[in-house]
Amino acid sequence: MSRTNISALSPMQKLARNPAVIAMTLALALAGCANKKNMPNSAGELGLGGAGSATPGSQQDFTVNVGDRIFFDTDSTSIRADAQQTLQRQAQWLSRYPNYAITVEGHADERGTREYNLALGARRAAATRDFLASQGVPASRMKTISYGKEKPVAVCDDISCWSQNRRAVTVLGGAGM
């Protein structure tokens, strides 16, 4: 291994070999990264997680401020009270933004056969669609699909995972605003 003659190095190369300069550069870089998520973006909104970060009428607005999913009890298609509130907010939002069409996805937990869970997911999606229709959302703007147990959001052999997978998700489509 050959040693480099320090006097032959440029001033930049000499600085790059100085441990204090390296540590200071690293500290400044990390400090800049730590504050980035709190900086306003070009639209004048707060960054991720900040109040007002969702553009009104956007998918993010729908998901964050309204809620895009509801949950079901085991082997049930009944719309629970907490789910009714979410679906009422969805109906109001969809009334405000009439150019969106939606797809209601029905899901089930991993227990049971594939066929049973596809049918259960279809019934959950239909129950969700029917509730939204009862709140004034035109049927022509809605379609349903069942994924059964094929698209879990949580995978484990535990009731906490199963309860997250028993859901209906409202997905926006169409032209939007």
From Swiss-Prot:
Lipid addition sites, S-diacylglycerol cysteine: C33
Membrane topology listed for this record: Lipid-anchor
Keywords tagged on the record: Cell cycle, Cell division, Cell outer membrane, Lipoprotein, Membrane, Palmitate, Signal
Gene Ontology terms: cellular component: cell outer membrane
GO biological process: cell division
Pfam family membership, one: OmpA
Domain of life: Bacteria
Keyword Membrane appears in the UniProt entry: yes
InterPro entries, sorted: Bact_OuterMem_StrucFunc (IPR050330), OMP_bac (IPR006664), OmpA-like (IPR006665), OMPA-like_CS (IPR006690), OmpA-like_sf (IPR036737), Pal (IPR039001), Pal_lipo_C (IPR014169)
OmpA-like domain sequence ranges: 59-176
CDD domains linked to this entry: OmpA_C-like
UniProt main location, coarse: membrane
PROSITE patterns: OMPA_1, OMPA_2, PROKAR_LIPOPROTEIN
Lipid addition sites, N-palmitoyl cysteine: C33
Function: Part of the Tol-Pal system, which plays a role in outer membrane invagination during cell division and is important for maintaining outer membrane integrity.
NCBIfam families in the cross-refs: Pal_lipo
Family named by the database record: Belongs to the Pal lipoprotein family.
Protein name, UniProt field: Peptidoglycan-associated lipoprotein
Species of the source: Agrobacterium fabrum (strain C58 / ATCC 33970) (Agrobacterium tumefaciens (strain C58))
